[in-house]
């Protein structure tokens, strides 16, 4: 098991942003078109019930042309060009599939200095990778 895994209390993570009681800007990478209804409910619940500003983006191409043209291009900055405070990767975005998380986004996620959270649903999926 990797020694790079850390567990923090949510309050500790939030205090590290320096925003105090201000809402955080959160990017939720998720596939809202996922076929399971519970998945869409989960994504909606995060977006609609959070006290923070949550933006949902789907980095998965929807067509062969999108894939060839590198669309959609999801950045880690909001509409005003500011870095998000938090990036959440929902389980509908399988990070082990290159088409789901393109190279440019992997590079951006590695360099991202904010809070990164990955929500895993199936803990038995490819446990050897």
Please provide the spans of the model-predicted regions.
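N-terminal acidic, proline/glycine-rich, low-complexity intrinsically disordered segments
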Residues: 1-7
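Compositionally biased regions
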Residues: 3, 16-17
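Extended catalytic core of nucleotide-activated donor transferases of GT-like folds
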Residues: 8-9, 14, 27-129
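A short, charged/proline- and glycine-enriched loop
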Residues: 17-26
């Amino acid at each position: 098991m990797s020694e790079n895994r850390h567990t923090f209390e949510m309050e500790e993570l939030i205090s590290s942003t320096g925003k105090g009681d201000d809402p955080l800007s959160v990017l939720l990478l998720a596939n809202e078109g996922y076929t399971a209804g519970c998945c869409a409910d989960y994504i909606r619940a995060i977006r609609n019930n959070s006290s923070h500003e949550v933006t949902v983006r789907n980095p998965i191409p929807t067509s062969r042309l999108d894939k060839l043209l590198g669309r959609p291009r999801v950045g880690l900055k909001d509409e005003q060009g500011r870095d998000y405070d938090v990036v959440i990767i929902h389980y509908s975005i399988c990070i082990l599939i290159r088409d789901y998380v393109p190279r440019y986004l992997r590079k951006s996620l590695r360099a991202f200095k904010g809070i990164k959270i990955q929500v895993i649903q199936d803990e038995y999926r490819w446990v050897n990778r």
